[in-house]
Each structure stands twice: as C-alpha cells, then as structure tokens.
C-alpha cells in the first residue's frame, strides 16, 4: 500500500514526484543500506556511498521513510542518512516497517534512539500528507 499512497500523493501534486529507490544492483556484495554495500567493490561505483541520493534528499523539507526491515536494511539506511542529514528531517512510519523475526528488541531500541535524536516516529494514519 506504500507504493499506492506514494502514487496518490504524486497525482495530487502534478509538479512533484515520489522517488522510489532500488538497492543491491551488484549480486556479489551485501547491501543492508540503500546507500552503500557493506564491503564496496572498488570496480563498481554502485557499491560506494550514494552521495547523489544524499544530496537530493538534503533538498527535501521532509523525508518520509517506510520499508523493511527496521532492524537491518532500513535501520542501516537511516543510520547512513543521518550521518549527513539531521534526523529531524525524517518521519519514520512505524506501521509501514517491521524487524526481522527475533530482532524486535533492536528495532525498538533503534526507534527510541532516533526519536531522541529528533526523528518523528508515527503511524501512517497519523501522517497528514498535506503538511509534506
């Protein structure tokens, strides 16, 4: 339903476009984060830190985050992003993500940590897209 909500948002704002990101274009590296692989391949720039995406996101007033898994991939992506963008720029939709089974404690601690750093954490039903 996240894809449909993003598309509906686009339709209501003809001059704006939601930006969906794919990761792991290199099958020989592990990508937890969307921004970089765990061990970058020196011969493959797609495995290095994605500063194009970071700089693009820096221009946004609000960055709405959803995805899987909060304990691993999404969490690492957010950690990478908040090294360059203030956590207060982000809204984490807590009901649009979940941890890997058995890692619920890590996801809970992550949400608490990011909340203390200024990230808004809320359910998708609490988000008013008109404010974004």
Regions found by a protein language model. Give the residues of each.
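Active-site-adjacent betaalpha module
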Residues: 1-132
């Amino acid at each position: 339903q996240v894809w449909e909500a993003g598309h509906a948002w686009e339709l209501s704002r003809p001059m704006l476009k939601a930006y969906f990101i794919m990761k792991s274009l290199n099958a020989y590296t592990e990508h937890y984060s969307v921004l970089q692989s765990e061990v970058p391949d020196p011969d493959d720039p797609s495995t290095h830190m994605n500063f194009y995406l970071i700089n693009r996101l820096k221009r946004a007033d609000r960055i709405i985050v959803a995805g899987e898994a909060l304990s691993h991939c999404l969490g690492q992506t957010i950690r990478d992003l908040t090294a360059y963008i203030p956590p207060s720029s982000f809204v984490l939709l807590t009901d649009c993500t979940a941890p890997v089974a058995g890692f619920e404690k890590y996801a809970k601690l992550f949400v608490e940590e990011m909340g203390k750093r200024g990230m808004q954490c809320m359910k998708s039903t609490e988000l008013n897209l008109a404010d974004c």
